Amino acid sequence: MTDLSLYRNIGIFAHVDAGKTTTTERILKLTGKIHKLGEVHEGESTTDFMEQEAERGITIQSAAVTCEWKGHRLNVIDTPGHVDFTVEVYRSLKVLDGGIGVFCGSGGVEPQSETNWRYANDSEVARVIFVNKLDRVGADFLRVVEQVKKVLGANPLVMTLPIGREDTFTGVVDVLTKKAYIWDDSGLPENYEVTDVPADMVDEVDMYHEQLVETAVEQDDDLMMAYMEGEVPTVEQLKKCIRKGTRDLTFFPTFCGSAFKNKGVQLVLDAVVDYLPSPTEVDPQPLTDEEGNETGEHALVSADEPLRALAFKIMDDRFGALTFIRIYSGRMEKGMTVLNSFTGKTERIGRMVEMQANDRNEITSAQAGDILAVVGMKNVQTGHTLCDPKHPCTLEAMVFPEPVISIAVAPKDKTGSEKMGVAIGKMVAEDPSFRVETDEDSGETILKGMGELHLDIKVDILKRTYGVELNVGKPQVAYRETITQAIEDSYTHKKQSGGSGQFGKIDYRIRPGEPGTGFKFSSVVVGGNVPKEFFPAIEKGFSTMMAEGPLAGYPVLDVEIELYDGSYHAVDSSAVAFEIAAKGAFRQSMPKAGPQIIEPIMKVDVFTPEDHVGDVIGDLNRRRGMIKDQEPGVTGVRIKADVPLSEMFGYIGHLRTMTSGRGQFSMEFSHYLPCPNAVAEEVIAEAKKRKEEKAKK
């Protein structure tokens, strides 16, 4: 297929358990890609193909599937709903042109829905909404529509209305055409009939139809004038307006149904084709220089342009190493040579495949707009740009969050050590939010991630997929250090031992930076007291020392250092001398600047039945939580709080005990805050103890 207007690159994203994967399964069934439906709760779904996914009933990796609907090519990505795997959602949104936001008809707008919606807004991805599970007890379509308005600040445009409620839910009314779609009891998605609107719904449908028309015609001044003069717009005219409003993020066409019961999914697929943009209708990707600054040029969406593509995911499966690629410009063909603009090296394109979850179809070429996988690429990582060697360029980089939790692991025997090294190398390539370090003193391997579940899954993969038996330590919090006072100081490095010596003197100011800014270095030196060529060495000296603070050896955050004077020696001064001076200055000045331990604070979202609210709030308060909001729902209460990560280990078990198994929660990193003195003293004492134990070894 070469007509780019017939392409749709879409993602399906939502909260855990809203029915994303089941919706994807129904799409595959309807588009003829699978013949037997696999259910998530039975561990059989097509896109949840990792053992851990099938077992836990959650999607961990973004599985890519290609299918067709009404002459259009759909590249569909099913993304995880659990907050520990939001990096998968983020990088999927980076390469998508549109999306389906799935909400649970009874649960409504749940915690992860907000996070994913925020990411999609940041990426300016057009979306349609599917309110799922309307066959469930407590499901209420219009209540969820109101929540979308209130909680997400979005403008849902009601396109279908449910016929019946809960166990009497039989179909939907298309508000645009005023036709009813009613499914029989066979459970087959194709077994439905199109009839007139049920008599008891005529007034409601008329009201929503009028609202739809009035909202749609606002996208076209001429059509709006004609409508105000009494002219009735055609369905095609309205579709054109809805398409424009959807692409501009003015509103979000909103549908209802039950993916599990095979009701209503066809209309969502029609909406993908009718309203979501093709690759040619989204803003072209900006090109950047080596520092990541935009150059003003763009990757134009055309097969005739030079190749510009982004590697957005690395995955090791039973077929070998796969690199998932979105092509923005030009063509990619089997056997061609491409330049990796990040490494400066070229690679030959070997086997190219079109993915269907865990199956693949071999292809020999692909073009702008395509999402594909290449087998066996050697030096490509997530976020790397692949381009025509004659036209080098760099696409906007992908930035991933820093881990907030770590655990120490060690193989139980020597044979596991080599296996673990190979396995971890593959896992780090696959997941940019998963980091691994080796403790130089103890030799322990430290795994770092976004949450307990994230690391649990990684340990599980090491054990079961790669057969590495492990000893696993307790989770550790990623504490940091910062300063609270601004000081002015001076440091001289002087060394004379025969022949040429070393000399470097720096006068500098150290002050607390804005939260989240990391380390900033600047110079206001006038004249030649410290030559400019030594500035990078001074910055490097300070920057290197930020890795280990004076209190407990944790990395230092949010510090600004300003060089304002100094002196040098024409013979003895060098970059090395000034770098050593900066390191000495850090050691000298940090203890004077009011150093402080800071801890990661998590944004916690708890759902609890109403009769357990007091227990849950009391427990969060005991965990040093700050309650931010309480929102009553149909089946319980949602509590939002900021809680230190150190207080949240093992929380899910405690919550289930408190709420008789009915409570749920999610959390994501929010910000760092100073620890209370008692906690800081404990952290410092623990660090001192570790240091002493290492010294004995």
UniProtKB/Swiss-Prot annotation:
<dbReference type="Pfam" id="PF14492">
    <property type="entry name" value="EFG_III"/>
</dbReference>
<dbReference type="InterPro" id="IPR000640">
    <property type="entry name" value="EFG_V-like"/>
</dbReference>
<dbReference type="GO" id="GO:0003924">
    <property type="term" value="F:GTPase activity"/>
</dbReference>
<dbReference type="InterPro" id="IPR004161">
    <property type="entry name" value="EFTu-like_2"/>
</dbReference>
<keyword id="KW-0251">Elongation factor</keyword>
<dbReference type="Pfam" id="PF03144">
    <property type="entry name" value="GTP_EFTU_D2"/>
</dbReference>
<dbReference type="InterPro" id="IPR009022">
    <property type="entry name" value="EFG_III"/>
</dbReference>
<comment type="function">
    <text>Catalyzes the GTP-dependent ribosomal translocation step during translation elongation. During this step, the ribosome changes from the pre-translocational (PRE) to the post-translocational (POST) state as the newly formed A-site-bound peptidyl-tRNA and P-site-bound deacylated tRNA move to the P and E sites, respectively. Catalyzes the coordinated movement of the two tRNA molecules, the mRNA and conformational changes in the ribosome.</text>
</comment>
<keyword id="KW-0963">Cytoplasm</keyword>
<protein>
    <recommendedName>
        <fullName>Elongation factor G 2</fullName>
    </recommendedName>
</protein>
<feature type="binding site">
    <location>
        <begin position="78"/>
        <end position="82"/>
    </location>
    <ligand>
        <name>GTP</name>
    </ligand>
</feature>
<dbReference type="GO" id="GO:0003746">
    <property type="term" value="F:translation elongation factor activity"/>
</dbReference>
<dbReference type="GO" id="GO:0005737">
    <property type="term" value="C:cytoplasm"/>
</dbReference>
<keyword id="KW-0342">GTP-binding</keyword>
<dbReference type="GO" id="GO:0005525">
    <property type="term" value="F:GTP binding"/>
</dbReference>
<dbReference type="GO" id="GO:0097216">
    <property type="term" value="F:guanosine tetraphosphate binding"/>
</dbReference>
<feature type="binding site">
    <location>
        <begin position="132"/>
        <end position="135"/>
    </location>
    <ligand>
        <name>GTP</name>
    </ligand>
</feature>
<feature type="binding site">
    <location>
        <begin position="14"/>
        <end position="21"/>
    </location>
    <ligand>
        <name>GTP</name>
    </ligand>
</feature>
<dbReference type="InterPro" id="IPR009000">
    <property type="entry name" value="Transl_B-barrel_sf"/>
</dbReference>
<dbReference type="InterPro" id="IPR000795">
    <property type="entry name" value="T_Tr_GTP-bd_dom"/>
</dbReference>
<dbReference type="InterPro" id="IPR014721">
    <property type="entry name" value="Ribsml_uS5_D2-typ_fold_subgr"/>
</dbReference>
<dbReference type="InterPro" id="IPR020568">
    <property type="entry name" value="Ribosomal_Su5_D2-typ_SF"/>
</dbReference>
<dbReference type="InterPro" id="IPR035647">
    <property type="entry name" value="EFG_III/V"/>
</dbReference>
<dbReference type="InterPro" id="IPR027417">
    <property type="entry name" value="P-loop_NTPase"/>
</dbReference>
<dbReference type="GO" id="GO:0032790">
    <property type="term" value="P:ribosome disassembly"/>
</dbReference>
<comment type="similarity">
    <text>Belongs to the TRAFAC class translation factor GTPase superfamily. Classic translation factor GTPase family. EF-G/EF-2 subfamily.</text>
</comment>
<dbReference type="InterPro" id="IPR047872">
    <property type="entry name" value="EFG_IV"/>
</dbReference>
<dbReference type="InterPro" id="IPR005225">
    <property type="entry name" value="Small_GTP-bd"/>
</dbReference>
<dbReference type="InterPro" id="IPR035649">
    <property type="entry name" value="EFG_V"/>
</dbReference>
<dbReference type="InterPro" id="IPR031157">
    <property type="entry name" value="G_TR_CS"/>
</dbReference>
<dbReference type="InterPro" id="IPR004540">
    <property type="entry name" value="Transl_elong_EFG/EF2"/>
</dbReference>
<keyword id="KW-0648">Protein biosynthesis</keyword>
<keyword id="KW-0547">Nucleotide-binding</keyword>
<dbReference type="InterPro" id="IPR005517">
    <property type="entry name" value="Transl_elong_EFG/EF2_IV"/>
</dbReference>
<dbReference type="Pfam" id="PF00009">
    <property type="entry name" value="GTP_EFTU"/>
</dbReference>
<dbReference type="InterPro" id="IPR041095">
    <property type="entry name" value="EFG_II"/>
</dbReference>
<feature type="domain" description="tr-type G">
    <location>
        <begin position="5"/>
        <end position="280"/>
    </location>
</feature>
<dbReference type="Pfam" id="PF00679">
    <property type="entry name" value="EFG_C"/>
</dbReference>
<dbReference type="Pfam" id="PF03764">
    <property type="entry name" value="EFG_IV"/>
</dbReference>
